[in-house]
Design a protein with these regions (language model features):
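N-terminal Rossmann-like or analogous alpha/beta NTP/dinucleotide-binding catalytic cores
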Residues: 1-47
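Structured secondary-structure scaffolds
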Residues: 27-31, 70-71, 75-175
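Short, well-ordered, mixed-charge alpha-helical segments that flank or form enzyme active sites
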Residues: 27-31, 54-64
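Glycine-centered flexibility sites
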Residues: 43, 59, 135-137
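Short, flexible, mixed-charge glycine/proline-rich loop motifs
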Residues: 43-51, 61-65
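Cys/His-enriched microdomains
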Residues: 51-53, 124
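Short cysteine-rich clusters marking metal-coordination/redox-active sites
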Residues: 55-57, 68-73
């Protein structure tokens, strides 16, 4: 795996860190399941059927434009049930937060880029994959036939390392 290569290189370069965490660690899996359950209980996750083009090699759905680019191989049309996060419900809140906190996104041209993106309706975010198609990942706490999609659980890793659910004082000092 890659992780030992990084940690070995950091030692040679005299680079120190407070914590090194991987998304495969039990402490991370615990936090992901906890957050997923909270978000589900809040009504921000729902099950729906999705149909689209799927790149088997990339393990993700792609747009028609991406399919036409020739950059993807082994593309198939796929229709399946998955769980979705209601991202669209938070669009106005995101815009307000960014505008109320001028330094939240740096540099300024990136902030403007994000605000421009948020002018178009946000799509809800698919956060799962059926175990029948993807046998690795963190199991959803509310449906054992599904795992969390890696790009959703990877973001949670930041707050796992910051002590969410394990070190309240550390978490409050960092977050």
């Amino acid at each position: 795996t890659m992780a030992p290569r990084f940690t070995s290189l950091w030692e040679k370069l005299h680079i120190a860190n407070d914590d090194f965490i991987r998304t495969t660690e039990d402490r991370h899996k615990k936090v992901v399941k906890e957050i997923l359950q909270i978000v589900m209980n809040n009504g921000d996750i729902y099950e729906a059927e999705y149909e689209g083009l799927y790149s088997v090699s990339e393990e993700r759905f792609i747009t028609e434009k991406e399919a036409d680019s020739g950059a993807f191989r082994d593309i198939k049309k796929l229709k399946e049930k998955n769980y979705f996060f209601k991202m669209s419900a938070y669009q106005e809140q995101l815009i307000k937060h960014i505008n109320s906190n001028p330094n939240f996104i740096q540099p300024n041209h990136r902030k403007n880029e994000i605000l421009g993106f948020l002018k178009k309706p946000l799509n809800d975010l698919c956060i799962s994959r059926p175990k029948s198609r993807l046998n690795w990942g963190i199991e959803l706490p509310f449906d054992d036939k599904y795992v969390t999609y890696v790009w959703f659980d990877a973001l949670i890793n930041y707050i796992t390392a910051a002590g969410y659910s394990s070190d309240k004082n550390l978490f409050q000092s960092l977050w």
